[in-house]
């Protein structure tokens, strides 16, 4: 078809740029938007079956379409998750086959300057997708509607490959060799037990040896903190010593307690970057969906209710031993009632 032919012709020129062909499937007012790359053709959001928003029927139909043998070479991305465009029903409907078609999730989106209006970070949904079992790498894209293709702001996707070609880039994405950054020239290389970011350690080792190389060539930029993030967004380890950070060579050893480990880098000006995880063993698909305050405008010294929603996508019930609420390092309260989250269900705990 004409669009594939145009891409092939552009890439054949070998001019230092690579074109990747794809399309966006959208559900206006529905579960979300998805980019799909490397297919023989495209589909329309006006397709009656695919656009059916009743009980997410259209999203489920799209997952089924991608899961067909013809979709084996396709790569898809969860676009700008959040309250505006949708969270894919909090990343529901996971199964191993569709997981093998979804490779990325946006942690930032928009044409505005980083930290200003028109730029929409969504880092918490990256963690949610990982907690729900999806094997995805982070991206930070511009969603350009007004030109400035690629240079509207400093957000970048970084794909690690030694094969700078269309298929070489796709293979790197399939291996999740990626990180997303708000600083256009921040460099990160991350390994666990000498396996690079995006790897899956199927057998759980006795310990995890993490190594992080991080640098920014700009003299005005500095690294203020580097963290290891694990299930439910917990910080498992952090480096914040200025001298150690300035060396750009960081390492630590951790117990293999969690299902995934990714790196979060924060610069002195607030710019942030996150890497693809290294997964360890089988992902435990349970965690926190949301923490919501019942009062829209809280007032000091007035009582309010905080509701924590927990999910369990496993095939067996899960017991919550306790839920701890803290603020500024101070414990506000502990719910130790021993609640049970049903299999393939959720539980709300008010506090």
Predicted features and spans:
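Asparagine-centered strand-capping/turn motif at beta-strand->loop junctions
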Residues: 310-314
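Intrinsically disordered, low-complexity Pro/Gly/Ser/Thr-rich segments with frequent PxxP/GP/PP motifs
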Residues: 330-351
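Extracellular recognition modules
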Residues: 262-266, 309, 350
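Short, solvent-exposed loop/linker segments at the N-terminal edge
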Residues: 199-206, 293-302
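Short acidic/proline- and small/hydrophobic-mixed sequence motifs that coincide with surface turns
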Residues: 221-224, 298-299, 315-320
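Short beta-strand elements bearing conserved aromatic residues within extracellular beta-rich modules
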Residues: 225-228, 321-325
């Amino acid at each position: 078809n004409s669009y594939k032919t145009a891409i092939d012709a552009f890439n054949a020129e070998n001019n230092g740029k690579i074109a990747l062909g794809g399309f966006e499937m959208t559900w206006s007012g529905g579960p979300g938007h998805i980019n799909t790359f490397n297919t023989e053709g495209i589909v329309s959001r006006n397709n009656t079956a695919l656009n059916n928003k009743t009980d997410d029927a259209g999203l489920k139909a799209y997952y089924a379409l991608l899961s067909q043998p013809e979709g084996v070479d396709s790569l898809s991305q969860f676009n700008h998750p959040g309250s505006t465009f949708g969270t894919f029903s909090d990343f529901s409907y996971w199964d191993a086959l569709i997981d093998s078609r979804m490779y990325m999730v946006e942690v930032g989106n928009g044409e505005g300057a980083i930290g200003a209006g028109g730029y929409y970070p969504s880092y918490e949904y990256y963690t949610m997708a990982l907690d729900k079992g999806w094997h995805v790498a982070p991206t930070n894209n511009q969603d350009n509607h007004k030109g400035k293709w690629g240079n509207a702001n400093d957000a970048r996707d970084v794909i690690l490959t030694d094969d700078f070609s269309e298929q070489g880039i796709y293979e790197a994405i399939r291996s999740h060799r990626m990180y997303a950054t708000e600083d256009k020239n921040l460099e990160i290389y991350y390994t666990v037990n000498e396996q690079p970011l995006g790897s899956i350690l199927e057998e759980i080792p006795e310990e995890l040896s993490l190594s992080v190389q991080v640098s920014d060539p700009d003299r005005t930029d500095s690294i203020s903190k580097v963290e290891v993030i694990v299930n439910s967004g917990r910080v498992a380890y952090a480096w914040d010593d200025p001298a150690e950070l300035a060396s750009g060579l960081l390492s630590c050893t951790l117990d293999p307690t969690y299902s995934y480990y990714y790196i979060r880098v924060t610069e002195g000006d607030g710019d942030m970057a996150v890497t693809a995880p290294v997964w360890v063993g089988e992902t435990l698909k349970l965690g926190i969906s949301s923490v919501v305050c019942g009062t829209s405008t809280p007032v000091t010294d007035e009582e309010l209710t905080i509701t924590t929603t927990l999910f369990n996508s496993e095939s067996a019930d899960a017991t919550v031993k306790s839920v701890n609420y803290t603020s500024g390092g101070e414990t506000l309260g502990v719910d130790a009632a021993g609640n049970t989250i049903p299999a393939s269900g959720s539980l709300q705990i008010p506090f």
